[in-house]
Regions:
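Active-site neighborhoods and metal-handling regions in enzymes and metal-associated proteins
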Residues: 1-356
Length: 356
């Protein structure tokens, strides 16, 4: 959050009190990056470890300090402070607690402008995702059917043409490849998309300096089998159970935790007999900076996410079922918590397999 310029290789500490001026403890040879530190705020300098420990004790002794750590590594994305540093701060006389809720409030909340940017990106991503599946269907019976890699490249071209940016991907996968949740095609290794295939397209993009939209669309190149329809319905209904819980709690202004939303989706898929094949969390934080953000995740499988979904945070909802060596299906939408309602994007999210 400090976004310090230049090189910093030595330890530094910044204490931000509830009231009063912040204090920075910095190394004597690394003063350049701190040139922008306001003069009215305190900045201490040290060279020796003895002076560092003394200054730290002067600042934090007897205080309750929030730091980026997660007790028991319950949420590893928040567990960023080395164990030795925690010991150092505690030995200086401070009581250390997790900053998890502060991260949600001060780092993960979207502005109105960011929400609007996300909504625009979501509309564009939804259009491109569906167009990609239809394109694959139209080429399946031709003399030149598309490969997964070719369709991936087409999607990236559409992003660029629409003024959107992405970091990598998207995921384009058929059949057994789709059973790997993080599969990505490559030019040298990519399956051909043929009639009869189940096609998964997971794509994400944003406007420049905007908030990502992250969606997964499922297609069937020809009528799906009864088994495939059953899997799709389990995934879709699990997604909708998560959305329903969010809508009920937020409209009633009742708290809801990320882990509870994961439980709601997982209960439906488990009841349908596919619980053992839903092998990842239901969703991840999407914060103003990162696709996989630092706010509350929709997770009670991989991690114990007990943070509340507070107004202003965004996240994905993406349950899936993966039968190794056979087929994988996932449905992904995004959620944003408003004051008394939940925004789901895209607004016209997928209800049925897109048969092409």
């Amino acid at each position: 959050m400090l976004e310090l310029p230049g090189m910093t290789t030595r330890r530094f500490f910044v204490y931000i009190p509830r009231q009063g001026a912040p204090v920075a403890i910095t190394h004597a040879i690394e003063q350049g990056p701190w040139a922008g530190w306001p003069a009215k705020w305190t900045k201490e300098k040290y060279s020796s470890w003895r002076l560092l420990e003394s200054l730290l004790a002067d600042v934090v002794k007897g205080k309750r300090i929030a730091m980026e750590y997660s007790p028991g590594d319950a949420v590893p994305y928040l567990d960023r402070v080395p164990a030795g540093v925690l010991e150092m701060v505690r030995n200086a006389g401070a009581t250390v607690v997790s900053s998890a809720d502060l991260v949600s409030l001060f780092y993960a909340v979207w502005s109105d402008e960011q929400r609007a940017s996300h909504e625009r990106a979501a509309r564009a991503v939804a259009t491109i995702g569906q167009q990609a599946i239809r394109l694959a269907g139209s080429r399946a019976d031709s003399a030149s059917p598309l490969t997964e890699y070719a369709l991936q490249s087409w999607i990236r071209e559409r992003f660029e043409a629409g003024g959107l940016e992405t970091d990598h991907g998207p995921i384009v996968a058929i059949g057994p490849n789709a059973a790997n949740p993080h599969y990505e095609p490559a030019a040298e290794k990519s399956a051909t998309i043929n009639r009869g295939d189940i096609l998964l397209v997971d794509l994400w993009a944003r406007e420049k300096n905007g908030v990502f939209a992250d969606q997964t669309w499922m297609g069937s190149l020809g009528p799906p089998s009864d088994r495939d329809k059953t899997i799709w319905l389990a995934v879709r209904d699990g997604r909708d159970a998560a959305i329903s819980l969010l809508q009920q709690r937020i409209s009633a202004r009742e708290p809801v935790r990320g882990g509870e939303v994961d439980d709601a989706a997982r209960a439906v898929i488990t009841k349908r007999g596919y619980g053992d094949f839903f092998i990842h969390r239901t969703g991840h934080s999407i914060d103003p900076r990162d696709l996989h953000g630092s706010g509350p995740h929709i997770d009670n499988l991989e991690t114990r996410e007990e943070r509340a979904l507070i107004p202003g945070v965004g996240f994905s909802i993406e349950p899936g079922v993966y039968l190794a060596g056979d087929v994988g299906m996932r449905s992904e939408v995004n959620g944003f918590i408003g004051a008394d309602k939940v925004l789901i994007t895209p607004t016209d999210y997928q209800k049925d397999l897109l048969v092409v």
